């Protein structure tokens, strides 16, 4: 049953079901417990198994509040999909590396080369794929809507700087030689065309092929879909750019965590603490040391997630809630290393 919320935080809210105001105190309290952001306007409350409510923020962007159980199920599917495709990602990186090399030497086609560059930037710089609809509706940029004005070149490195999803500034430097050469040549070619035709290039899209056809998010996902058929364990599993970001987040988490632990182990050795640097909590001298050791592990987990969030241009809470597989965190805690 749909319930409409009317009013503002300052004036107070009223709720209507079938155009009749809800006055029952218990029912109103149940609605309040749903914790719908007071700043949302034109709120419709569904409270079904999937969606609690939806409304619009100050920029008139639709915001959906999903039911926690639905989010949990979707996350479980996402992480199970990732686990089932773990070998795929390794093979995909090899394929992308080959397509980059072929593109650079002229052995590959222009479209595949552009897509390989995009996927590399997703993995190395943490950018989202983006699409024209999101650019139009929210004035935000992703890789497929990247423009020449977002690029700066210096010392064989390219600085990419744009406003992405939810108004978050995305800044990253890429020093990959092939990526640098691809983007530098793209800018030079566009500038030459602009000079010849007296048109501006700053607002032109970077990733194009066949004389101006723009690479879309669908093109990149189709590339991944075809690769999925070849490399994934199951033909029913299709990897998308979202899956790529999830896999990248978890890979980065483990990499960062291991680096942090190595630093902590070296510090323990310098302090001359009892036991080897690799000793686990069960080897600690007493319960006090074990508790201190475990607190250190949780602190390092948090730090690793913060580093992943920064890499993916996300907040800590979003990264932990939507990107890092809880089973991986549990595994790290259980291993006590």
Q: Which stretches of residues belong to each language-model region?
A:
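The DNA-contacting recognition helix of HTH DNA-binding domains
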Residues: 315-316, 326
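A positively charged, amphipathic N-terminal helix/segment that binds anionic biomolecules
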Residues: 1-142, 146-191, 200-247, 251-266, ...
